[in-house]
Amino acid sequence: MGIKSLDDLLAEGVSGRGVLVRSDLNVPLDGGSITDPGRIIASVPTLKALSDAGAKVVVTAHLGRPKGEPDPKFSLAPVGAALGEKLGRHVQLAGDVVGSDALARAEGLTDGDILLLENIRFDGRETSKDDAERLKLAKALVELVGDDGAFVSDGFGVVHRKQASVYDVATLLPHYAGTLVDTEVKVLAQLTESTERPYAVVLGGSKVSDKLAVIENLATKADSLIIGGGMCFTFLAAQGLSVGSSLLEESMIDTCRTLLDDYGDVLHLPVDIVVAEKFSADSEPQTVAADKIPDDKMGLDIGPESVRRFSALLSNAKTIFWNGPMGVFEFPAFAAGTKGVAEAIIGATGKGAFSVVGGGDSAAAVRQLGLPEDGFSHISTGGGASLEYLEGKELPGIEVLN
């Protein structure tokens, strides 16, 4: 792909120039405290390189899903403080997105300074379906860095969105892929274009409908496709099994039956399930065979025999993609499935396999369960973007950089 990199921009020279960076700083918060700083840490290399080179750096990012207007609970203030801490330098926070405070602060930047704009989604034009509205916001963002400025796309978690700060600004400024986006695209290309076999895919999460396109796409490419998490129950139901009060997408049962008919030699389902009476951390766990789930109980994790079988498949793999937990890993009693599969992937990686964790809940599980992040070849910052790439979809935020 003909995408210019951050190194290209640095070679051209950025000292004294305004550089607009779209980062992905959408981290989970609990009462104002950041519970997983992974995306903040991942954004540091690009921002540090630009600051060190003397650029006047203006960062735009979103947090959560505000409704197109300022909302204090979605302010980037705690994120800005954490970002400054990780960078080891002061990060200014503008009081607005492209208003008078942002403009005044941008004009006052000196070489190497970093300004973080307030949550870009406080401006409804960011996510507008109206091209003209998005373009107006993009032009206002460009004004903050000047006509001789540049745009660096470094928020991989949003490149599947056609939004003002992701797509439209790249049509107005010289544009480059940041370190993170550059790495992510190369990693995903390795999964799709130069895959060493055997290729194992592990998919979890709650809904088949969320993963249907990627299942259909990867089932034709993978040697084994392991299904866990809440969505396994719709597959079990498609086999005619009772799943008790487990999560079930009835509208997807026929689709799952077709997938099993077409790809039964590739798809692997759990053979035992950890069940409980209710969705609660203090529910009493009980392990049962997958065809013996009681009517009054719900599945909250895969069982130990499933972990053993899945681990055997993974131990021989040369390429592994994992997206989605095997169970409710947030509850310790139902975390063993996710941890066991993750440890098997780490073991395979140690033997030379190329492993990618596809962002989202999987990345959160790695950190929450205390697993070594360097035990995997790559942990993606973009769950949805990774899946859409592997579905074969064009990502607007990548295509516009070409």
UniProtKB/Swiss-Prot annotation:
InterPro entries: Phosphoglycerate_kinase, Phosphoglycerate_kinase_CS, Phosphoglycerate_kinase_N, Phosphoglycerate_kinase_sf. It catalyses: (2R)-3-phosphoglycerate + ATP = (2R)-3-phospho-glyceroyl phosphate + ADP. GO terms for molecular function: ADP binding; ATP binding; phosphoglycerate kinase activity. Pathway: Carbohydrate degradation; glycolysis; pyruvate from D-glyceraldehyde 3-phosphate: step 2/5. It is found in: Cytoplasm. Its main location: cytoplasm. ATP binds at K211, G299, E330, G359, G360, D361, S362. Keywords: ATP-binding, Cytoplasm, Glycolysis, Kinase, Nucleotide-binding, Transferase. Its EC number is 2.7.2.3. One of its GO terms (biological process) is gluconeogenesis. The keyword Chloroplast does not apply. Substrate binds at D24, L25, N26, R39, H62, L63, G64, R65, R121, R161. Pfam families: PGK. GO terms for cellular component: cytosol. Monomer. Belongs to the phosphoglycerate kinase family. This is Phosphoglycerate kinase. The lineage of its organism: Bacteria, Bacillati, Actinomycetota, Actinomycetes, Mycobacteriales. The gene is pgk.
